[in-house]
């Protein structure tokens, strides 16, 4: 059964491209203008700091022997494929879920690119209060988190299609 792409959630894949351009472009600027661990204050509580993340979120598993690079690459590909299938099966009118999936895919692919090309993910956004610093992150991480939040919001707003209607 072939459906026109514009009638499916895949219509929102343009957002994946936007996330990739913003993410990879910002990381390239960091690579060109920063040394590792160099930090530039922008405003109070916010620095740009070049860091290399060999693990996942919050450097989870970063201290392992290198197998995590391929593990997280596999996870990114698997999640991207599953979400694209879900988008294909969904109507283009399900904007919130399709936007959420596109943000997650864009973020996953942005970090996947880093893992495959550099062997690590380039992080540079550094929020802090006093001496406490939130783990450094990047635009791909933001897209994934925003997408995950939208999935949660959508689960509360969208009626459950499996619910049996009484009456």
Curated annotation (Swiss-Prot):
Family named by the database record: Belongs to the peptidase A8 family.
Protein name listed in UniProt: Lipoprotein signal peptidase
Protein purpose: This protein specifically catalyzes the removal of signal peptides from prolipoproteins.
Domain of life: Bacteria
Membrane topology designation: Multi-pass membrane protein
Subcellular location: Cell inner membrane
Gene Ontology biological process terms, A to Z: proteolysis
A Pfam family reported for this protein in Swiss-Prot or TrEMBL: Peptidase_A8
Originating species: Photorhabdus laumondii subsp. laumondii (strain DSM 15139 / CIP 105565 / TT01) (Photorhabdus luminescens subsp. laumondii)
Signal sequence segment: none
GO molecular function: aspartic-type endopeptidase activity
One Gene Ontology cellular component annotation held by this UniProt entry: plasma membrane
Active-site annotation: 123, 141
Top-level taxonomy: Bacteria, Pseudomonadati, Pseudomonadota, Gammaproteobacteria, Enterobacterales
Membrane-crossing residue ranges in chain numbering: 5-25, 42-62, 70-90, 102-122, 137-157
Keywords on record: Aspartyl protease, Cell inner membrane, Cell membrane, Hydrolase, Membrane, Protease, Transmembrane, Transmembrane helix
EC number: 3.4.23.36
Predominant subcellular localization, coarse grouping: membrane
